[in-house]
């Protein structure tokens, strides 16, 4: 969040926030004995949950980030819910911040809109086989012509810390508000 709101680019291309596929999709290609907890190696890694990006060894699942925000997941459903929440918040931040930077910023383009194959985790908004993730709906909402948006600095706050944000009214319609 902090990186995005302090960035100043004319465009954000090939950007994304990663998250896992839904439980039903994962169960269709990950063997039952490997489903939980996910670990490097095996089907999770074969399907890009681990080692998909050299800069982040636990990408694209990002277990370390999930544990930072939510603690260790107790089951697969909780893990997926946590991961999809982070992806959704990240995608919403990307699209809304890009719009707040208009007219200097002219576009936000995701790296991968939909997955072409069974992927355990990734930056897509639509999982294989054409099932929208929660992030898809956040992106859709973030692109509506008129909206109120909050520029939130970060997701984790500690007791006693002052919460600061900016509220924006975005209007890309042809009508005055």
Language model segments and positions:
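Substrate-binding clefts and catalytic carboxylate motifs of secreted carbohydrate-active enzymes
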Residues: 2-177
């Amino acid at each position: 969040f902090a990186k995005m709101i302090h960035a100043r680019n004319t465009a954000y291309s090939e950007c994304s926030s990663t998250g896992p596929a839904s439980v039903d999709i994962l169960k269709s290609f990950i063997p039952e004995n490997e489903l939980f907890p996910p670990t490097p190696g095996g089907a999770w890694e074969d399907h890009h949950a681990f080692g998909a990006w050299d800069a982040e060894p636990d990408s694209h699942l990002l277990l370390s980030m999930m544990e930072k925000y939510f603690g260790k997941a107790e089951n697969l459903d909780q893990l997926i819910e946590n991961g999809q929440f982070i992806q959704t918040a990240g995608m919403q931040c990307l699209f809304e911040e890009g719009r707040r930077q208009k007219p200097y910023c002219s576009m936000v383009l995701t790296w991968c809109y939909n997955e072409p194959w069974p992927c355990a985790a990734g930056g897509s908004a639509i999982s294989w086989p054409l099932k929208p993730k929660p992030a898809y709906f956040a992106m859709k909402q973030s692109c509506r012509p008129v909206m109120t948006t909050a520029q939130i600095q970060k997701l984790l706050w500690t007791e006693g810390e002052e919460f600061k944000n900016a509220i924006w009214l975005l209007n890309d319609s042809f009508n005055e508000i």
